[in-house]
């Protein structure tokens, strides 16, 4: 049951956070400014997280008045190695968010101070298992950018406002509240930035309702999974949805993803930390997934979820090595150079565990286009890998109104049937976008789990039917849309027409009579 009061408090907090973030940016474009707000939030979080970790240990040991933030740097240095091993990073007391913020207004070199602090945080992880997780995390936080101001003084003025604005966000105290408050606020801000950014926002963020549906589809009947993977992970929100649905300890061996855009890659790693995912529980890489996959040693994955980039270009047959790549070779053909969608599908299938499920948002064209894409569909169907195709409503995503599909794949199917679901109308309109409600999601997942046939909504097609349709996997080929046009009673209509014609004749006769009388009087 939904806690209405808690939801209201959450909404109020979100509105307050967005008001602060929006006020902070001033005349700077929100999309450009997001890295500063989100980066500052991350700096605050890891500072408070480290303090809480150290203080809790000291209090348990009986040192009830201890506060790491008040220690001298030289005394704190003694604990550096142990803390890096346990937490993955270290921050000197003088460089904690609270202490830098307290002196910020009087620091004429605040830009240099922050630059040094961020460099020290990243360097603290060097040589440890967390090195790759922290390397370059603050690269997009340019304290000397003209976006912050034309002069050093103006830039520092903006940085002071940033520290105070994020410091004033009511995210609770880590020791008294769920640290997910930070993660929740971060997700909310990313949603707002993405919705205001149009196309570029849609490229890095999957709306929460779509993430929920994908993850629910991929975890039907499961209470835990070994690993979750996203080959185009964006800001990581879709990866993290598995934890919110199954529970914190239900992802036994962690989160894996790859992202080609370095700014988005940094946002993803920050997102992991803000959701209290330990550095040893996630592995996010920044590379081209199709050409340079980074998780050969980590696959297979029990859950694969992704909102793929739509019909982007890739090397394809220009690279002679790819046709022999074990991910693509089984289909005997490569996805077209101009449309990489099916390459991502084959990559995901290759890395899917035998007991796993892949739920992937796809561009609808891959369901019916000919050529190489048809041959790959044939391979998928002939080998019984396609479990379900779901047609989604249009306008669900930021920056595009296109109606996408979900392809669900499994390797352990016991039949060669494919369930087709037409969820075109499973949504409500919210401002400029459509949205899947909890009821919409529940309905789709319920029919998916039961593999149930419902007139005008779902159809379970056998192998022969798909072959007869030339391996076309468009939902409209198998699920007839309901005719919502008004049904016409022909007999009643003819009677009405006959009555109108008769009435018309009566009126004509009366008009003729009037005209005759007028002419007779002339």
Question: Where do the language-model regions lie?
Answer:
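Conserved S-adenosyl-L-methionine
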Residues: 200-306, 311-313, 317-322, 327-332, ...
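A structure-centric signal for secondary-structure junctions around beta-strands
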Residues: 37, 182, 225, 252, ...
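A conserved structural/catalytic subdomain of Rossmann-like adenosyl-cofactor enzymes
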Residues: 2-4, 8, 298-522
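Conserved, well-folded catalytic cores of nucleic-acid-processing
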Residues: 23, 165, 169, 188, ...
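Non-catalytic, mostly N-terminal accessory regions of nucleic-acid modification and defense proteins
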Residues: 1-213, 217-218, 222, 280-292, ...
